């Protein structure tokens, strides 16, 4: 993720993939410790490597006996890593609805009604995460612990108390840090 200003200012929109990677290697050299950056976008050329995420939310997920699943019906920004999860859950719920022996039209309607709620929840989290990354400049002056906390809770899928379940000691350190800041 980067802002339009950064994309154009560094010339990424005009560079080849190799040139773009070379610039990023220079920018992040002190963190790469001599290692090279890798790209999984071998098939992309030029500015296509720098994609604007396309949010898809189809009004209807089926037509006749053709059914859309996953990203074909609804996308969730890749920053929350749930695209495959949504597709598999769609497939499972569709199979369950079809297995109940309902008329096809009713099974497809019930599948869509059931899945749409879960999809909207994840799309909302994905939107929050996307906005965090699109506005990352506002967090760059945070101290590392505050930046990490903000990053971990950006989608609102991971709450303060959920962090406690995941890493109690780390969160207690965050709370101590925040309390110290509040009393300065």
Which sequence ranges carry the predicted segments?
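Conserved FAD/dinucleotide-binding core of flavoprotein oxidoreductases
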Residues: 1-51
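Phenylalanine-focused residue identity feature
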Residues: 12, 28-31, 53, 63, ...
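Polar low-complexity intrinsically disordered regions
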Residues: 18, 61, 81, 182-184
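Conserved mid-domain beta->alpha element of the FAD-binding
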Residues: 47-128, 132
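C-terminal helical "tail/cap" subdomain of flavin- and related membrane-associated enzymes
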Residues: 96-184
């Amino acid at each position: 993720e980067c802002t339009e200003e950064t994309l154009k200012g560094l010339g990424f929109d005009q560079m080849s993939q190799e040139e773009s990677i070379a610039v990023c290697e220079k920018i992040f050299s002190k963190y790469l410790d001599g290692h090279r950056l890798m790209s999984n976008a071998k098939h992309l050329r030029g500015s296509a490597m720098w994609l604007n995420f396309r949010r898809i939310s189809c009004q209807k997920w089926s037509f006749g006996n053709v059914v859309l699943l996953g990203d074909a019906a609804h996308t969730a920004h890749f920053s929350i890593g749930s695209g495959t999860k949504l597709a598999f859950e769609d497939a499972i719920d569709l199979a369950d609805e079809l297995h109940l022996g309902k008329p096809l039209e009713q099974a497809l309607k019930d599948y869509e009604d059931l899945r749409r709620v879960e999809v909207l929840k994840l799309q909302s989290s994905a939107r929050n995460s996307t906005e965090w990354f699109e506005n990352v400049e506002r967090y760059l002056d945070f101290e590392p612990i505050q930046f990490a906390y903000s990053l971990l809770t950006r989608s609102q899928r991971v709450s303060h108390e959920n962090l406690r379940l995941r890493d109690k000691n780390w969160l207690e350190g965050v709370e101590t840090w925040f309390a110290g800041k509040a009393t300065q």
